[in-house]
Amino acid sequence: MILIVMSFIMIVPFAWMILTALKTNQESISVSPFYILPHNGWHWENFGTVWKSYNFLILYKNTLLMIFWRVVCAVLTATMAGYAFGRLKFPGKNFLFSLVLVQMMIPAQIFIIPQYLMVSKMGMLNTQFGLVFPGLVTAFGTYLLKTGFEGLPKDLEEAAMIDGCNIGQRFLMIMMPLTKSSMVSLGIFTAVFAFKDLMWPMIVCTNANTTTLSAGLAKMQGQYGSDYPAMMAAATLAVLPMIIIYVIFQKQFVEGIATSGGKL
């Protein structure tokens, strides 16, 4: 029963969003929100109008490129750092990892001003690198991969050392393949966080040709009025990439959480 109630609570907003996208603007603001079905026909043309008017192909391209590079950079850096913290011994290891944990406790908004100044001085405003910059390194990913590497038996590396493998070979050929589920989990987390990121794209991308879906949706809000069906149609189109990603990787997502002990 609880599962049914929770499913209903989560599904209703999506249904309301899609059905509002099929109404006229007058109907969306004059009819009670409890009457969610369109009364004057199903206006599928709202999707076509939004697609053409707001250059959704450009928004999709910018968003997917940002997600791709953030995922690649976050997984690579977190895997190397996680291996170092989880398997190697070096001076100051515990102190450095405590700094990683402290960074996880600090709100990301605190770093926006220094990050903006760095991107601005490098001349990377309104560029893909400017969008990707905050996601190059992730403390959460380092923690997630560290727990993944720590859960692997030490005998694997010891056997590889006996066979003559150096540290690079042990990392690339033995340890990394065994933490694939944690890497996929981190990739999904990073993709979701990047997709939802609104403040950073709004700050670094003032050009309509370089902005992302989240920032583009925010800019649809008018000062004196809004076309709500158009906004809901745009929101429906915007969530499609994340729905597709989840449908494809839901098994790996669950496995990554279970095997690594990571959590949001």
Regions found by a protein language model. Give the residues of each.
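A structural signal for multi-pass alpha-helical bundles of membrane permease subunits
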Residues: I2-L264
